[in-house]
Amino acid sequence: MGLEVAADSVASALAAQAGGAMRVELCGGLDGGGLTPSFGTLAVVRERLRIPLYVLIRPRVGDFVFDAAEVEVMRRDVEQCVRLGCDGVVLGALDRHGQVDLATMRVLMQAAGSLGVTFHRAIDVSADPSRVLEDAIALGCERVLTSGARASALEGIDTIAALVRQAAGRIGIMPGAGLSEHNIRALRQHTGAHEFHASARGVIAAQVPSPHPYIRDLGGDYQRTDTARVQRMVDALQQA
């Protein structure tokens, strides 16, 4: 049982490790739901991290229906993860009917080779999460990250519990979205899940005050994984 931390910087990844996370999911643009991280970020994190590193492969924001060019971008990103010695990748692709795009997933998983694969929250916007779960099992994914098709895992707690029962040990079900030190124990007890996913972030104040506060997307405060929050969440899990 343990906590995977979503990190979008070197500092966040190392903070997750220091707090006792069992694994890091590295991404970029976490505030937009997460994108594939930059090569530089990935390379430096791989060099410095001692715990397992999984990498989100998502070329853009928006839905999870990808065209041929986007699939090629993702395939090359997966290959880069293999070359850098990452432990796994986080994937997900749907077709226009809201079902798993099996052809795309097979291309990406073939590129991943022996790397572990997590099927991400595309399941939460699919037409049938139960069917997506079976497809993820058939594809050979290790786990599915899900909020139970709701805005937060706490809201989707009953669906997550049902997916855990359906999985019956064939694949991991990892609750994510809105997890904190205040609710992770309840999620563990109600769902029976063994792995949990959170960013565990806190606000970092801007080092240089902006002379133009009306320009909100440049400069200013930002968020970073908080080691103490990670530790509190890990402790809460151990007490569950």
From Swiss-Prot:
SUPFAM superfamilies: CutC-like (SSF110395). Gene3D superfamilies: Copper homeostasis (CutC) domain. It holds the Pfam family CutC. Keywords: Cytoplasm. GO terms for molecular function: copper ion binding. Transmembrane segments: none annotated. The keyword Cytoplasm applies. Belongs to the CutC family. HAMAP family: CutC. This is PF03932 family protein CutC.
